[in-house]
Structure formats: structure tokens, C-alpha cells
Swiss-Prot record:
HAMAP family (alphabetical): RNApol_bact_RpoC
Entry binding sites for Zn(2+) 1: 70, 72, 85, 88
Disordered as annotated region, ranges: 1378-1414
Top-level lineage group: Bacteria
Gene3D superfamilies from the UniProt entry: 1.10.132.30, 1.10.150.390, 1.10.1790.20, 1.10.40.90, 2.40.40.20, 2.40.50.100, RNA polymerase II, clamp domain, RNA polymerase Rpb1, domain 3
Gene name as annotated: rpoC
InterPro entries xref list: DNA-dir_RpoC_beta_prime, DNA-dir_RpoC_beta_prime_bact, RNA_pol_asu, RNA_pol_N, RNA_pol_Rpb1_1, RNA_pol_Rpb1_3, RNA_pol_Rpb1_3_sf, RNA_pol_Rpb1_4
Function: DNA-dependent RNA polymerase catalyzes the transcription of DNA into RNA using the four ribonucleoside triphosphates as substrates.
Binding residues for Mg(2+): 460, 462, 464
Descriptive protein name: DNA-directed RNA polymerase subunit beta'
Record-listed Zn(2+) 2 binding positions: 814, 888, 895, 898
Family per record: Belongs to the RNA polymerase beta' chain family.
């Protein structure tokens, strides 16, 4: 025992390990951990408070209570270390061992481990191939189980009830053996021959073809192979020995008043011991079977609730009826071991306080209250006091500090100098939520924060608190300074925009200064330089906004790269001239020579960063802030009631709207419109009226009349305070001003529907009681929404971080030339995101070629920065193939070239950057800004969306996309017959400017290659009906068109015209009526054939179509045969905001998903079933594929149409899994990126595409084995992509067949749980299931990701930690090689190790180089 302990001691010093392995403990293993058996349920003696011997807190088993002191007090002090007292049997050692020494309980009857029984799918059930219900009946003594059938016809593992058992015993006597309880299960497990089972199963797999069977067999096979590979015996799932947790981990604490607080585990252990002891006694007494059975069942239940209380049956409860916390509850959930103690620890040397604004600070500084600093830097102060000889001991130093002697403050100043501290504001949503600052000591108790970093922390000064942490070691200080100092983090990692942008007062001050006023005092004066302007301003000769001309000095670089002053004359204003003083060298004055709004200032800082570098930008931003504050104070801008100008036109607009509403009401009462239409119209009218009032108000606010110096009256931009605040972007928006001075407009009910009577008043006029009451709904809903949103957004971020946490840049270049071709993003003919924004900061995958000269303009592998992107713009290249994280070929992690620019630093990404976590934070951080609601599109909203034509927005040449197909009709019009036709407009350089979708049946008004001017109509169509157009000419022949059966005649009351409407066919007497269709016949009476085939043209009509041709009528190409009214489309609910993002990342299939064509081929319709129509696609080989489609679904294709694989054939939202299967990874990535971006763009949030791509890469990291070839995999098994590629490489190297596979798209939760690392998965969700599975497979965690390393308490393999881990591995390899060399030298005649395939044999398990820790 003692030898074992020494071994333990030595391990604890030098914790070098490379992996952690998990398995099932064998009874021998448990006994070897144990320091003695716990025999009694007693805990401590109630009088002496000493632990009882052999009890749950026994000192003999677990170690002494006090350091170096045995229980009876015979041996005390250090000199007796290691002695075992002969009186009380306690070893004299540190009391800390009570945290690590375990005991054990010898169970009188075996007990099944509940995790392997009840954690679904039941592992016991899988191994034994029995149902959970049957195993439970055996375990809880309700049934017998046959162990050895002997010569009888019974089967092994057969279940029989008591009566059956008695009958069979009478019949066969002792020929067979049957048991019940855990003994039976253990016997079954012990006698199972795993190797033979595996072989049988593999044989069955090859033989069977039924899907369900394959699935079942491969699941069982996986579990059995797990046992086989890991060397874990199946019978260990049934326990004979129960380990006992060290007592200090389940403490018993005396409270005052003689009561005790105890851990629930002690209760649970006590029950187990009591029942176990009772069972032992009953066995000795040879008690009747029925009593024993009952006692064994109770023991099983007691152990169950100790391991996982409440998993089976009713949970055990304590005295106060609350469920006891079992071992499983200790580790899972938010307050379990993983999330509470391992992933989130509280740290020393930290404090928190309220923050106040510190405008006098520099960007890298923060104000730290003296008292706080004194406490935080104590150890450093003690050290300095001792070095200076002012204190001899730590105690003396402590006294000095506590009495706050004057010398202490001087020392504090010294200690703090250049020692950065880290400030953190919760919630820390992205990496800018923790930044380092140099502390400046201040009086008072509040931390001072620099105003410009508030945006990054999302902090304001209404009572926010922040925490301070002190980095202690030199390395930590170094990293805090170089990587985390606020002045080094001036860009948002999400989009590369500056994060130190001025806001509010600063913006207002700068805006007010840089505005111009017509006819200001001293207008038109010429000044020689800025100092002259300053003098004139100080003497009151000019005002801030006066327009003047001034000569300014700017700096430009000459050939040598030196700054040369250049003088220019500028027409500008006084304020702008004064501001020009703070411009950094290298920025021209033109960037300042305009009214500075928030967006302009952001652009200014961005330009400064790109042109002048980090240092100058930080200084510039600081100066901008100081000027802004000063000038805002000088400006004295304030708000008065008079500033809210109510537009004069308001009354007229309201009167007109009321009149229109009355008109609609009249129509409704006379029955012309339905109530729904009336409601939609009313809402629409008021909505428009509200917008009109708002517009009139803004027009009135925006300008004011002034007299210029020539005495003419002109209008200039207004100096109205409210308008200036909104216009500059300092505070408020047009919508808010509209509520102050226009009208509040329409309000929503709690259920989201709009109340049709609007609030016509504004806040200046005041609301009446009804109006006030209506407004309360919206306000309350807003608050409730916010609370929900925060929780949901936090959970999304957690899942995202978990799925990407192990993605780190691990190498510089993977050498791939794959990538995605990036184009400008065009929607509805408008460029939403230009090409330059999409490729900025990426690496070119192939050479970018100048389209005019065909020369290489930019070589492959170049990082595209601002200058190169400008060049691409100038060259007119409209498509660039760039590297992307999705095509990166690095096995573990990503390479720097595929990722491109690190957005938060503005330069090439470094090896070791944790790009996964950054991506997750960038997507999760704006989550709280997204909406939570589902939009009902319909009613008023969708009417305006019915476009009926497209027009060009720019001059250029028309180009038809390859998908565009059309026919020319008799009038010479082009009629589109493609479902996904697109038109593009190209400019003179041949660059695509815009792209428009042309619906089926539209009249195309321009030709391919035609030059058009802006505003030209390209195509028009009827938005309310969808036509069916003939692609061939001939005479119409009706088929199955019978009045009253498949069609009905409709007569229009007004015009008297009759049309045929297709109705759902009535089946008469079991005769199945085919769908109504027409064929075309040529002059000879033969069917017209589809070009190039021998299919005849037949056009079938869906229900609801209006047939516009007559039987026998001649039709020409492009003529309309029928119309389908479009309002039949139901209004679809569109999921918006946060739920939509979550839905995309969870890869959920939408409920009415559209259907994509599985193959390329020709469409035809087969026989319909009752509720479904049968669609057949005949592929190019002539094989037909059938699909059944619900009748109410809208089919987008018609008979004889040729469709491409992956084209949408039934309308509905797309299913990402289908896109992946039929169109491949690139299309899927584009789909997810675009859809996620749509949600964020709606809220005005910018996120770089590559963050979303990184997440998609992680969602695609597993593959499905189709054919295992000569590999070890099982068909249908899901494995890590990297594992599969490695295995395939190995097999190919041996000239065998590699495995073939399909890509699998996993949602983020699924992907997190299916990672290689069981530690990471267990700490995320479903802890029990993950650990159970890992234990059976005997999994080994190589600690690759960040999370696993945090949990085991090592440096994470990212950033500086990556270098540390690489160096450590290299050093270990070197040492191993040196040891080997030394051994070779020592005995030169020993044979070299046998090598197989060029690799030395793995060392035996007991050699020290096996680095796995149990």
C-alpha cells in the first residue's frame, strides 16, 4: 500500500501527460485504488466528533484529520512522518490525503451500473441483444434468465416468469441453469464470446440488405468492437466492489447548535452500506429466497441512486423531501464540476467596482482607485518593502501596508508603473470584452474608463461595474501588454472596422464644428495659416462655422520615403481649419473638409489606420475625442420644446387619410370588399399617412431660410438641435423624431397584429388616455422580448464556441489551389455587397488575370489588401477565386493562407490564432441585437412586394445567363420559359453590374447583347397569375377535360365570358380519372414530339388553372394556354432574427421543405394516388425516378420540361441537407452564408463571411462511410473527416482499396457532441451519455482542443500556448531519442528494435514513455 502511495506522490509533482484515457474500472482496479474497506455506516462519534473506525470517515482508511497527528494523539509532529500508529492504525501524514485516498465497499451481491443500463441506448441491452425491459425485469428480480440451457430446448438468455420457471424445472429438472438479478446478467456478460460475435455480425452485415437490420447490426457491432479494441471486459459493467469517494470531497461540517451539514453523498453511501450489511447477515442466516431477493433488489436500488439518483424509479429524498444529489449530478449541468469549477474559476488578485468616465486618460490607461490597487498589488509591495529593508518579515510588511504609511504609497506608485491590469465587463461577448490597461492611481472608489473603449466593452456609465485582474508572472504581463493592451486592439475582429469610434457628445461636437453657416461673421476672409485663423477666432472676428479660405501645410512622401511639407489653399470653415491641426501626417486635408458625421469619423479613423499605422491612429483618435468633448461644451447644444416643429401639412394629410378610410368602410358595408381586405386597406392607408407626415416633418426640420451676404434669401441645412443630433449620428433617429414631432403612427397588439386606429398625436402634443393605453402593449412586449433574447443569444454563442473551440491556425500554408469564386452579391438587381468587400483580406487561390491584356496582375497566394482590391476594381475583374476555410486541406486546424487576414489586427493571421472561437464570438456577440419574432408575411406587407417588371439601374449591355430559355411568339415578343432564368447587365469593361431574375412566362423586352440605358424596362409580367406557355405550335387536343368531372365552367357576371376552371376530379364508380391535359397535333394529325426525343408534347394543368384555349384551336409558339391565379399562395410565416440563425446552424430541415430534382432529366407525371401526385424524372440513361408529392404543394415544373440535378421542382424553403447531397459543399456554404448574412444585414450588423464559413467547416467535419473498402470502418458509420483521410492514406500506401464516403451536415449541437474529445463533449451537454459511450469504447482524449486543456489545467494550444506545446513535444521526442542512443551505446550487441513498415515497434505498456494518464 505504502509503495503505491509513494508512486502517487512522485506523479503529483511531475504531471507530464499527453492524453487522458477513460475506461470501466475492473474490481481489481477498484480494490487497488482503495486504502481499506468501509464496513460501517457510521460517520463520526456524536460526542467526541472523532470519525468512527471502519466508518465513512474512518481515519485509518482515509488518513489523519490533523496534519502529522494520529487519531489517538500518540504520534504528533513531523518527525514521525510515515509511522503507522499501532493503537489507532492511522498513518502520520498530511491531512490533505483525505482528499485523494479512496475506500471501497465489498458488495454482497453484484450490482449493475445504472449508466450502462439506463443511459439510452442501453449498452447492456446492446451487448446482450436483449430489450431494456427484459434486462430490467431480470435485474429487479421479476423474472428468471436462462444462463446455460444444457440439453433442453430452451435458449440462452431466454426470459421466464416465476410460474414458467417452476413448470420448466418440473419438466427438465437440473438440466438447465437459470438465475435472476445482477448475477444472471454478469454470467451472461462473462460467457459472451466477443470475438466470435463480432465475426458473426460482420458476416450478417454483408449478407443482409434491409436498411433497418443494417442499422441495428452496425450499432451493436460498434459497441462490441469497442470492447474488443479497448480490452475492457463486458462483465465489468456489473460491479462487485463499489469505490468510496474520499471523505473531504463529501464533507460533514458541524454547524453551531450541535447540528451538522452534510453532503448528500454520505446519506446515499449510508443506505448502500446498511443494505449491504443486512444482506450479508441474511446470507449468513440462510434466509428464505424471497427475503434475499427483496434485499438484493433494495441494494441494487441504493447503488443506482448513489450513482445517478432519479435515473430509474422515484428519486431518493432526504429528510426535507428534496432529491439527493448523486455522483452524476455532481458533474453535469451548469453547477456541475465541469462548468462550475473546471471551465469557470474564480481567481485571486481581482476586484470589481463601478466605472466612471475618464476623458483625461490616454487610450492605454485606466484610473485605478488607490485602495483597490493597494489590495491588488499587496505581494509586490511586501516584496519591495523587504528589499528596501523597511520590513524584516512578511508580517511586519503587512502591518505597514495596513496602517497605510506614506512610504507605502510611494512604493505602490513604483510597483504599478508599467504593470498592466486587465479590465473585464460582463457579459464578455467577444474578445474585446477583456482588455489590458496601464493603471493610473486616482482618489475615490470608482474605476475610470477611457470613453473610446466603451464601444468595445459595450459599457456605459449608468452604474455599470467592471472587474480588474492582475497578471502576475512576467510572461503574463508581457502578453497582456503586447496582445491585450487597449491601444493594440483598435479593430473589431468581427468585421475589421475600427472599434475606437467616437460616439454621442464627441460626434456632436465634431459635427457642430465642421458644419458651415451661410453668411457667418467674417465670411470670405483669406488666411495665411491656421494660427492666424486661431487668433481671429479668439478675438471674435469669425465664428466656428464661417466659410473662409486658408493656406494649409500637408505632408506627402517623396521618393526617399521622407515627409515633405506641401502648401495648398483650401476653401473651408474656421472649425475645420482648427481641426486640421490634429490630422496625422499622410492624411490629406480633404478627409476633414466636410461635415463630420459618425460614419465619416469611422471612415476617417479607418483610413488613418491603413495609411498612418496604429500608433498615429491611436494618438489621432485621442485628440479627436478631446476636441470633440471641448467643442460640444462650447457649442452648448440643447433641446427645447420649440425645436420639435410639427409640420403644417399634418392636418391635411390626416383629413385625407380619414376620408379614404370612410370610403373603404362604405365599400365594406355594401359588400364590395371582405373584412380582411378592408382591414388591410385601412392599415395600409394609415401606414402611408404616417410616412407622409414623417417626410413632411423631416423636410421642414432639415432646412431653414437665411439671407446670404448678397441679400438673397436661400435655404441652408438647419441648425435645429434635434435635427443636428440625429443627422450627426450622435443620438436619436428619424423614426424617433417622427414620434416627437410627427405622429406616432400604427401600434401593434400583444399578439403582433396591428391595431387599425393609429395614434395621430405626437409626444409634443401629448397622448390621450386611449392612445397612451395602446402604446403600453408595444413597450411591454419590448421588455419581455429583451429578456428572452439575452438568454437565447447566450445559448447560441455557447453552442457556437463549443463547436469551433478546437479550430486553430496550425500551419502557414496547406498548399491547396482550391477555393470559391467570389462575385459581388446582387439581389433584386441591386448590389448589396460589392466584390471588393467580399475578397478584402482573403488570399487569391489562382492568379488574377488582367481581362484586357491577359497578363497576371496578382499572383496566386497573395493576400488581397486595400490597394490590391482597388487594383482589381480598376481592372474590371468581376470574379476572383479566393482561398476559404472550407477548402483548406490542413487535417487538424486551418492554415493561415486559407483564412487570410486577421480582421482584429489588420494583417496576415498568425499561426496559433484561435480563429474558431473568434468566429463564434463574432456571430454570437450581435445576437442580442437581432429580433426574436416570426414575421407573418401577408396582408399589407406583401402587396407592395408584388413586382410586375424589372428595370435597369445602370447603363450597359444585356447578357442572358445560361439558365435563360425563351421562345418568340407570333407578335415577335420573347416569352421566358425557364424557371430560373437570369439577366445580367454588363458595363463597358464587361464587369457585371446587376443581375435580375426573370420569372416563367414573363415578356422579355430586350435581346441578348443589346445596349440599354439606365431605367430601361427589361421584362414585364402579370404579378397576379402564372401562365402556362406553349413551347411548340399545333392544334390543341383536349384529353380528360370533361365538364363537371375535371373542369367546371365559370361565367363572369360582369362580362358574361365563360372560362374552364380545372377542379379536383370526382371519381365515379372506382374509375380513376387522369389529370386534365392537352396534346398538340400537327397538320397530319400526328402528335407533336418534344425536340430531340420521341416523347409527345402533353401539357397537364394543375387544379385551379383557367384554360384559355378551345379544343381544336391552332396555337403558336409562346401562346398562353392557361393561367393559374397567384393569390392561391398562402401567406408564409418567415422565421426571422435569432431563431432563424439558430435554425441554420442547427441544420434543421424546414417543415414544408421544397423538393430538389435528384437527377438531371425530363419531367413527366405518373398515376396519382389519393392525396399525392406522382412526378417522374427520366434521366439521360432512360432510368426513371419517381417522387410522390402532396396535392396541395405547388409544383414548379410541367410535363416535358428538362430539369437539372439540384433544381427546385416543388416550391418551399430549401433543405440544407438536400443542397449538400445534390449540389455539393460549395453551394451549401453559399446558402448558409447568404441566409445568415440576410438576417444580420437586416439589423445593420456587419460580419465577415469567413466567420460563418469557419462554423460551416465544423458542421461538415464528419463523413458517412458508404463503402469501407479495405479499411476498419463499418458501412453507415460516422467518422471524423481527418480520421478517414488518414486511414485512407494508410490503405492507399499499402495498395489497397480506400473507403468511399458521403459528406454529412451536422447541426452545431450534434457536431459539438460528436467531437473526438470526450472531455469537451461531456462538458458541453448530455454528460452522462457522452461519458458512458467513451468508457465502453475505452476512448483516449489527445487534448487537442482548447476546452480539454482548460479542464486539465494546462496552457491552451493556441496563441503563445501553441508554441509551448510544440516545443514541449519536440523536447520529449529529442529526449526519447537521446535515451535510445544511450541504450544503444551501453549494449552495442543488442539487436536494433524490429521495425514494421519503417516505424519502430510501440514500447510495451509499462515503459515510462507511454504518456497516457489513467
Amino acid at each position: 500500500m505504502k509503495a503505491l502511495l509513494d508512486l502517487f506522490k512522485q506523479v503529483s509533482q511531475d504531471e507530464q501527460f499527453d492524453a487522458i484515457k477513460i475506461g470501466i474500472a475492473s474490481p481489481e482496479k477498484i480494490r487497488s485504488w482503495s486504502f481499506g474497506e468501509v464496513r460501517k455506516p457510521e460517520t463520526i462519534n456524536y460526542r467526541t466528533f472523532k470519525p468512527e473506525r471502519d466508518g465513512l470517515f474512518c481515519a485509518k482508511i482515509f488518513g489523519p484529520i490533523k496534519d502529522y497527528e494520529c487519531l489517538c494523539g500518540k504520534y504528533k509532529r513531523l518527525k514521525h512522518r510515515g509511522v503507522i500508529c499501532e493503537k489507532c492504525g492511522v498513518e502520520v501524514t498530511v491531512a490533505k490525503v483525505r482528499r485523494e485516498r479512496m475506500g471501497h465497499i465489498e458488495l454482497a451481491s453484484p450490482v449493475a451500473h445504472i449508466w450502462f443500463l439506463k443511459s439510452l441506448p442501453s449498452r447492456l441491452g446492446m451487448v446482450l441483444d436483449m430489450t431494456l425491459r427484459d434486462i430490467e425485469r431480470v435485474l429487479y428480480f421479476e423474472a428468471w434468465c436462462v444462463i446455460e440451457p444444457g440439453m433442453t430446448p430452451l435458449k440462452r438468455g431466454q426470459i421466464m416468469s416465476d410460474d414458467d420457471f417452476l413448470a420448466k424445472t418440473e419438466e427438465y429438472g437440473d438440466d438447465f441453469r437459470a438465475l435472476m438479478g445482477a448475477e444472471a446478467v454478469r454470467e451472461l456478460l462473462r460467457t459472451i464470446d466477443i470475438d466470435r460475435e463480432v465475426e458473426t455480425l460482420r458476416g450478417e452485415l454483408k449478407a443482409t440488405s434491409s436498411e433497418a437490420k443494417i442499422k441495428k447490426i452496425s450499432k451493436r457491432l460498434k459497441v462490441l468492437e469497442g470492447f474488443q479494441k479497448s480490452g475492457i471486459k463486458a462483465e465489468w459493467m456489473v460491479m462487485e466492489v463499489l469505490p468510496v469517494l474520499p471523505p473531504d470531497l463529501r464533507p460533514l461540517v458541524p454547524l453551531d447548535g450541535g447540528r451538522f451539514a452534510t453532503s448528500d453523498l454520505n446519506d446515499l453511501y449510508r443506505r448502500v452500506i446498511n443494505r449491504n450489511n443486512r444482506l450479508k447477515r441474511l446470507l449468513e442466516l440462510k434466509a428464505p429466497e424471497i427475503i434475499l431477493r427483496n434485499e438484493k433488489r433494495m441494494l441494487q436500488e441504493a447503488v443506482d441512486s448513489l450513482l445517478d439518483n432519479g435515473r430509474r424509479g422515484k428519486a431518493m429524498t432526504g429528510a426535507n423531501k428534496r432529491q439527493l444529489k448523486s455522483l452524476a449530478d455532481m458533474i453535469k449541468g451548469k453547477s456541475g464540476r465541469f462548468r462550475q469549477n473546471l471551465l469557470g474559476k474564480r481567481v485571486d488578485y481581482s476586484g470589481r467596482s463601478v466605472i466612471v468616465v475618464g476623458p483625461q486618460l490616454k487610450l492605454h490607461q485606466c484610473g485605478l482607485p488607490k485602495l483597490m490597487a493597494l489590495e491588488l498589488f499587496k505581494p509586490f509591495i511586501f516584496n519591495r518593502l523587504e528589499m528596501m529593508g523597511l520590513a524584516t518579515t512578511i508580517k511586519a510588511a503587512k502591518k505597514l501596508v495596513e496602517s497605510q504609511e506614506p512610504v507605502v504609497w510611494d512604493i505602490l506608485e513604483e510597483v504599478i508603473r508599467e504593470h498592466p491590469v486587465m479590465l473585464n465587463r460582463a457579459p464578455t461577448l467577444h474578445r474585446l470584452g477583456i482588455q489590458a490597461f496601464e493603471p493610473v492611481l486616482i482618489e475615490g472608489k470608482a474605476i475610470q474608463l477611457h470613453p473610446l473603449v466603451c464601444a468595445a466593452f459595450n459599457a456605459d456609465f449608468d452604474g455599470d461595474q467592471m472587474a480588474v485582474h492582475v497578471p502576475l508572472s512576467l510572461e503574463a504581463q508581457l502578453e497582456a501588454r503586447t496582445l491585450m493592451l487597449a491601444s493594440n486592439n483598435v479593430l473589431f475582429p468581427a468585421n475589421g472596422e475600427p472599434s475606437i469610434v467616437p460616439s454621442q457628445d464627441i460626434v456632436l461636437g465634431l459635427y457642430y464644428t465642421t458644419r458651415e453657416r451661410i453668411n457667418g461673421k467674417g465670411e470670405g476672409i483669406f488666411f495665411a495659416d491656421v494660427s492666424e485663423v486661431q487668433r481671429a477666432y479668439d478675438n471674435g472676428e469669425v465664428e466656428l462655422q464661417t466659410r473662409i479660405t486658408v493656406r494649409l501645410t500637408e505632408y506627402e512622401r517623396d521618393e526617399q520615403g521622407e515627409w515633405q511639407p506641401v502648401k495648398h489653399r483650401h476653401e473651408t470653415t474656421v472649425g475645420r481649419a482648427l481641426l486640421s491641426e490634429i490630422l496625422p501626417k499622410g492624411l490629406p486635408f480633404t478627409v476633414l473638409n466636410k461635415a463630420l458625421k459618425k460614419k465619416e469619423i469611422s471612415r476617417l479613423i479607418n483610413q488613418s489606420f491603413r495609411r498612418c499605422g496604429l500608433r498615429d491612429t491611436v494618438i489621432f483618435a485621442d485628440k479627436l475625442m478631446q476636441s470633440g468633448f471641448r467643442l460640444a461644451t462650447r457649442g452648448g447644444i440643447s433641446i427645447a420644446m420649440e425645436d420639435m416643429l410639427i409640420p403644417k401639412a399634418k392636418e391635411g394629410i390626416l383629413a385625407e387619410a380619414s376620408r379614404e378610410v370612410k370610403e373603404i368602410d362604405k365599400q365594406y358595408s355594401s359588400g364590395l370588399v371582405t373584412s380582411q381586405e378592408r382591414y388591410n386597406n385601412v392599415v395600409d392607408i394609415w401606414g402611408k399617412a404616417g410616412d407622409k407626415v414623417g417626410k413632411a416633418m423631416m423636410e421642414q426640420l432639415a432646412t431653414e431660410p437665411v439671407v446670404n451676404r448678397h441679400g438673397e434669401e436661400v435655404r441652408q441645412e438647419s441648425f435645429n438641435s434635434i435635427y443636428m443630433m440625429a443627422d450627426s449620428g450622435a443620438r436619436g433617429s428619424a423614426a424617433q423624431i417622427r414620434q416627437l414631432a410627427g405622429m406616432r403612427g400604427l401600434m401593434a397588439k400583444p399578439d403582433g397584429s396591428i391595431i387599425e386606429t393609429p395614434i395621430t398625436a405626437n409626444f409634443r402634443e401629448g397622448l390621450n388616455v386611449l392612445q397612451y393605453f395602446i402604446s403600453t402593449h408595444g413597450a411591454r412586449k419590448g421588455l419581455a422580448d429583451t429578456a428572452l433574447k439575452t438568454a437565447n443569444s447566450g445559448y447560441l454563442t455557447r453552442r457556437l464556441v463549443d463547436v469551433t473551440q478546437d479550430l486553430v491556425i496550425t500551419e502557414d500554408d496547406c498548399g491547396t489551389s482550391h477555393g470559391y469564386a467570389m462575385k459581388a452579391l446582387v439581389e433584386g438587381g441591386e448590389v448589396i455587397e460589392p466584390l471588393r468587400d467580399r475578397i478584402l483580406g482573403r488570399v487569391a487561390a489562382i492568379d488574377v488575370v488582367n481581362p484586357d491584356t491577359q497578363e497576371t496582375a496578382i499572383a496566386a497566394g497573395t493576400l488581397l489588401d486595400e490597394d490590391l482590391v482597388d487594383l482589381i476594381d480598376r481592372l474590371g475583374v468581376d470574379e476572383v477565386k479566393v482561398r476559404t476555410p472550407l477548402t483548406c486541406e490542413t487535417r487538424h486546424g486551418l492554415c493561415a493562407h486559407c483564412y487570410g487576414r486577421d480582421l482584429g489586427r489588420g494583417s496576415h493571421v498568425n499561426v496559433g490564432e484561435a480563429v474558431g472561437v473568434i468566429a463564434a464570438q463574432s456571430i454570437g456577440e450581435p445576437g442580442t441585437q437581432l429580433t426574436m419574432r416570426t414575421f407573418h408575411i401577408g396582408g399589407a406587407a406583401s402587396r407592395s412586394a408584388l413586382a410586375s417588371a424589372v428595370e435597369t439601374k445602370s447603363n450597359g449591355t444585356v447578357g442572358f445567363a445560361s439558365t435563360m430559355r425563351y421562345v418568340t411568339n407570333a407578335k415577335g415578343e420573347r416569352v421566358a420559359i425557364s424557371r430560373s432564368g437570369e439577366l445580367a447587365i454588363f458595363d463597358d469593361n464587361g464587369r457585371e453590374r446587376e443581375r435580375h431574375k426573370i420569372p416563367y412566362g414573363a415578356t422579355v423586352l430586350v435581346g441578348d447583347g443589346e445596349a440599354v440605358k439606365a431605367g430601361t424596362r427589361l421584362a414585364s409580367w402579370d404579378p397576379l397569375t402564372r401562365p402556362i406557355v406553349s413551347e411548340y405550335s399545333g392544334a390543341v387536343r383536349f384529353e380528360n377535360i370533361e365538364e363537371g368531372v375535371t373542369v367546371a365552367k365559370q361565367v363572369d357576371e360582369v362580362t358574361g365570358l365563360s372560362t374552364l376552371v380545372v377542379i379536383t376530379p370526382k371519381t365515379r364508380g372506382g374509375k380513376i380519372v387522369m389529370r386534365p391535359q392537352i396534346k398538340l397535333v400537327n397538320e397530319n394529325g400526328e402528335d407533336v414530339k418534344i425536340a430531340g426525343t420521341d416523347h409527345s408534347v402533353n401539357i397537364s394543368f394543375p387544379v385551379g388553372a383557367l384554360i384559355t384555349v378551345r379544343d381544336g384551336q391552332q396555337v403558336a409558339v409562346g401562346e398562353v394556354l392557361a393561367r393559374i391565379p397567384q393569390e392561391s399562395q398562402k401567406t408564409r410565416d418567415i422565421t426571422g432574427g435569432l431563431p432563424r440563425v439558430a435554425e441554420l446552424f442547427e441544420a434543421r430541415s424546414p417543415k414544408d421543405a421544397g423538393m430538389l430534382a435528384e437527377v438531371t432529366g425530363t419531367v413527366s407525371f405518373g398515376k396519382d394516388t389519393k392525396g399525392k401526385q406522382r412526378l417522374v424524372i427520366t434521366d439521360l440513361e432512360g432510368v426513371s425516378h419517381e417522387f410522390l408529392i402532396l396535392k396541395e404543394k405547388q409544383v414548379l415544373v410541367h410535363d416535358g420540361q428538362v430539369v437539372n440535378k439540384g433544381e427546385m421542382i416543388v416550391d418551399g424553403p430549401a433543405d440544407p441537407h438536400d443542397i449538400l447531397r445534390l449540389q455539393g459543399i460549395e453551394k451549401l456554404a453559399t446558402y448558409i452564408v447568404d441566409e445568415v448574412q440576410d438576417v444580420y444585414r437586416l439589423q445593420g450588423v456587419k460580419i465577415n463571411d469567413k466567420h460563418i464559413e469557419v462554423i460551416v467547416r465544423q458542421m461538415l467535419r464528419r463523413v458517412n462511410i458508404v463503402d469501407p473498402g479495405d479499411t476498419e470502418f463499418i458501412p453507415g458509420e460516422q467518422v471524423e473527416r481527418s480520421e478517414l483521410l488518414n486511414e485512407n492514406d494508410r490503405v492507399v500506401a499499402e495498395d489497397k482499396r480506400p473507403a468511399s464516403y458521403d459528406n454529412v451536415l451536422l447541426g452545431i449541437t450534434k457536431a459539438s457532441l460528436s467531437t473526438d474529445s470526450f472531455i469537451s463533449a461531456a462538458s458541453f451537454q448530455e454528460t452522462t451519455r457522452v461519458l458512458t459511450e467513451a468508457a465502453i469504447m475505452g476512448k483516449r482524449d489527445d487534448l487537442r482542443g482548447l476546452k480539454e486543456n482548460v479542464i486539465v489545467g494546462r496552457l491552451i494550444p493556441a496563441g503563445t500556448g501553441l508554441a509551448y506545446h510544440i516545443a514541449r513535444k519536440d523536447k520529449e521526442a529529442l529526449e526519447a531519442a537521446e535515451r535510445e542512443a544511450a541504450r544503444q551505446l551501453a549494449n552495442p550487441f543488442e539487436d536494433a528494435p524490429v521495425t514494421v513498415g519503417g516505424e519502430p515497434e510501440a514500447p510495451a505498456a509499462d515503459t515510462p514513455s507511454d504518456d497516457s494518464a489513467e
